[in-house]
Structure formats: structure tokens, C-alpha cells
UniProtKB/Swiss-Prot annotation:
GO MF entries: antiporter activity; xenobiotic transmembrane transporter activity
Function of the protein: Multidrug efflux pump that functions probably as a Na(+)/drug antiporter.
NCBIfam families: matE
Transmembrane regions listed in the UniProt entry: 11-31, 53-73, 93-113, 127-147, 160-180, 188-208, 243-263, 280-300, 316-336, 357-377, 387-407, 418-438
Chief site of localization: membrane
Assigned protein family: Belongs to the multi antimicrobial extrusion (MATE) (TC 2.A.66.1) family. MdtK subfamily.
Subcellular localization, as worded in the UniProt entry: Cell inner membrane
Organism: Photorhabdus laumondii subsp. laumondii (strain DSM 15139 / CIP 105565 / TT01) (Photorhabdus luminescens subsp. laumondii)
Membrane topology: Multi-pass membrane protein
Signal peptide feature range: none
InterPro entries on file: MATE_fam (IPR002528), MATE_MdtK (IPR050222), MdtK-like (IPR048279), Multidrug-R_MdtK (IPR022913)
Protein name: Multidrug resistance protein MdtK
Family annotation (Pfam families): MatE (PF01554)
Tagged with keyword Lipid metabolism: no
Amino acid sequence: MQKYLKEARSLLALGIPVIIAQFSQTAMGVVDTVMAGSVSATDMSAVAVGTSIWLPVILFGYGLLLALTPIIAQMNGSGRRNLIASQTQQGFWLAIFLSIIIIAILYNSKFLIDRQHNIDPILAEKAVGFIHAIMWGAPGYLFYQVLRNQCEGLSKTKPGMVISFLGLLINIPINYIFIYGKFGAPALGGVGCGVATASVYWVMFLLMRWYVKRASSQRDIRPKHRFAAPEWHILKRISALGLPIAMAVFFEITLFAIVALLISPLGVTAVAGHQIAQNFSSLMFMFPISLAAATTIRVGYNLGKKSIENARISAYTGIMVGLVFACLTATFSIILREPIALMYNDNPEVITMASHLMLFAALYQLSDAIQVVGAGVLRGYKDTRSIFYITFIAFWILGLPSGYILGLTDYIVPAMGPQGFWIGFIIGLTASAVMIFARISWTQKQPDEVILQHSTH
């Protein structure tokens, strides 16, 4: 028991800074929406539409680069710190390639937006302007993630916390300048949010680079050459590990986007209630996703030290701590569901709908904690392909079809509307949690030499 309590303290020491960093980055999006809304409803809607296209694309790149964390954590644990700099250099090359692809996709976003029926032309123009502004921040964001993953792989999570919080603070005045046209800048409205966010991402990268170059804990991690050509075998290994993570992230984001579209014909009350429940759930999601990052670091580090037993302790401690947090956030969601809904909207019908859906959201958080932290465990073991297959089956084969059948058809019960889709979420996430937990158990039953060979490959 003492081992698990000690591990829980180590996990929380790593995880709490990640939680603050995640909340800071999420808050940047909230600030953009609120400040754009102060100009006009059209500007706020343009930011929302633009963000719905920007997020899946950029988070795909984020997911791909997440592979660096377990790679670096295991090198750190095994005493091979001399190899870390080359992994980071190749991470930058991967970020460059990703940035080119992302900018090319986002540059052509006008075609996607114009395909939406009955969209207001001014709204479409502003949304495209927002995307064309924020896309130039993609390289800065991805470069920042490369260095953040290096730090987190070395069990240094506080730099990401501090710099993300500074990014949030810097975002507000830059938004003010470009939205309202202050200090000689043009008044860009919602498009100014894109300019500000892109600028902040570059500032965050430069701050993280400054830290990494001066941190005493990383003085021994220096590249042999200031410029290193792409090493295709390293890039291939990072991509092979990161692509399943990126696809899993993409599956989850697009699932929620498609459900929002399927609910949209059910009326304003249904859409607003669903949006409130989903938005609040996404805030609560910061807890398990941050603990998952900490668990990946601890599992990877212990495997690097060839300590199979400590890696197992890290894995189960991470899942248990995640469940404790989920029980707390679920209880909070149930008890305060009406006041929470009132923070978003004062329409009685919307509040009733949102409050009802928050009950489903509370159940959802328990399964979500297991599957998210469990995925972090599997990343630590470098078993990312299974995450890809499990999330695809759970979300797209089980969750979405069951939600559609319950929400919009009379095949099993009379059409339940948004509630049916939330039951679908619970089915999908529970299936994912069961399959991921089973995969962890199977992995840990393998012979020690097989686990170490796979995890250090």
C-alpha cells in the first residue's frame, strides 16, 4: 500500500502542473469566444466555426508528437540521455512537415465552409479570415509541443504550466489590440483572435526554447550539431508510435462534431442543452488527460529503468487516482448541475435540458477516466496501435451507431433526442475502458523480456 501512496504523490506532482497547463490552453479558447462576442454575434460564431475546423487538424499534429514523451521518458530512465537531443531534433523535422500539411489544408478551408448550406456570407468570410490568421501559428504551436514533450519526458512538467499560463495572460491584451484596432493595428474583430492566438503560440515556443537552453537539469541534453538532417529511421519510429495516437484523438474529436451536427435539427433547446453539457464535460476532461500524461511519464521512466513491477504500480495508481478525480467531478456535476447550466444560459427550457444531460455527463466521466488514463498507460508501454483499434471500435462501431439508434430512431425505444446520444457516449466510453483495461492486463502478463524489448524498441 505504501508503494501505491508514494507513487500517487509522484503522479500528482507531475500531473497538477499539466492540469493547470491544460486549463490555461482551454481558457485561451474561452477568452477568444467571449472577446469576439463583445464585437458581434457574427464574430463570435465565426470564431466558433473556424475553431471547429482548426482544432481537429492541429490536434492531429499534437497527437503525433505525443510519441516523444514515452520515448524520452524511457531514455531518461535507462540512462541514455545522450540520445534525447537527436530525438528532439527529429521531432522538429516532423513538426515542420506537419506544419506544411496543416497550413495547406487550412488555406483551402474556404471550400469546406462554402459547402455548408445556408451559411451567412459575412460569417463565412470572417471564419475563413480567422483560419487564415491562426494557421500561421501552427509551426509555433507544434515546435512548442516538441520542447514541452522533451521536458515532460524528463519529468519536468512545471515549465509547460508556467508558459501556458503566461500564454493565457499575453493572449488577452493581444486580442484587445487586434480585435478593436488599438495602437495603430487594424480592427479585425473575430479575425483578430486568430492573429493573437497565432502570435501567442510563437511567444510560447520562444519562451520554452529559452527555458530549455538555460535549464541546469538539461545542460547535458545538447545536440552535437546545430543543424541535423532528417534521420528517416528515427522519424519513421516516432511516426509509427505517434500516428495511432493522432488517429485516436481525431476519432474522438470528430465523433463529438458529428453528434453536434446530428442533434442540430432537433431544435435550439436540444442543441443549447447538449452544448452546455459537452462544454462543461470538456473542462472536466482536463483532469484525466493530465493524469494520463503523468502516467505515461512514470510508466515509461520505470520501464527505462527495467523495473517491470514499478511500471505496473505506476499504471494501476494512475487509473485509481483518475477514478478518484472522476468521482469528485461527477459528484460536483450532479449536485451543481443547475447552477452550472445557469452560468451558460438563463432560458428555463435550456437549463432543464442541460441539467438532465449533466446526469449522463457524470456517468460518462467515470468511464472516461479509465479509458483516458488507461491509454496513457499503454503509451508508456509504447503500445499505441491497440489504442487506435480500441477507440475506433468503441466510438465508431459501438458508441455512434447506438447513440444514433437511441436518439433519432424508434427501433428500440421512442426517439430519445440528445439523451440517446449521451447514452451512446457512455456505451462507447465504457466499451473503450473495458478493452483498454483488458489490454493493459494482457500486456503485463507477458514475460519481462518481451515487455522490455517492446517498450525499448
